């Protein structure tokens, strides 16, 4: 069985917090989008950030799964 490198151990120690922070930011963006429903410029900016955060979250989930197999 493959073992974690030092860097992977560091990442494993912080990844749950990273995921939680991303989930919280996504929820905040979604609330902000509802509050700015008629401001299309603001909505476009928020949607771009939301897409980026969702993509980052997906990558963190995949990384979490990989690291959990090594733990």
Mark where each language-model region is.
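Charged, heptad-repeat coiled-coil alpha-helices that serve as long linker/dimerization "arms"
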Residues: 1-71
């Amino acid at each position: 069985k493959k073992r974690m490198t030092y860097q992977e151990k560091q990442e494993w120690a912080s990844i749950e917090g990273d995921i939680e922070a991303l989930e919280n930011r996504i929820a905040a963006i979604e609330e902000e989008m509802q509050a700015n429903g008629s401001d299309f410029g603001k909505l476009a900016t928020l949607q771009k950030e939301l897409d980026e955060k969702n993509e980052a979250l997906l990558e963190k989930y995949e990384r979490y799964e990989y690291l959990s197999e090594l733990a």
